[in-house]
Amino acid sequence: MNRISVLGCGRWGSFIAWYLATKKGKEVFSWGPEGDYSYEVLKNTGKNEYVTLDPSITLTCDLAAAVQRAEIVI
């Protein structure tokens, strides 16, 4: 199981996405609702106060696409 979607991109979600991509080599989709503060910060800067997202992580606000692409949804 290599394609994982993490629903939510706040503190925990961004860390889980980062960990799975950088430490476990998984293909990760990180979903957040458009307009949400955490999503907008990650979209605009690629990082928050805790982690810098790996470039391999796909950040999206399209919930259907995030779920359809994944083998596992967290």
Where are the language model's segments positioned?
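NAD(P)+-binding Rossmann beta1-loop-alpha1 motif at the extreme N-terminus of oxidoreductases
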Residues: 1-53, 57-67
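An anion/phosphate-binding loop that grips the pyrophosphate of nucleotide cofactors and donors
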Residues: 70-71
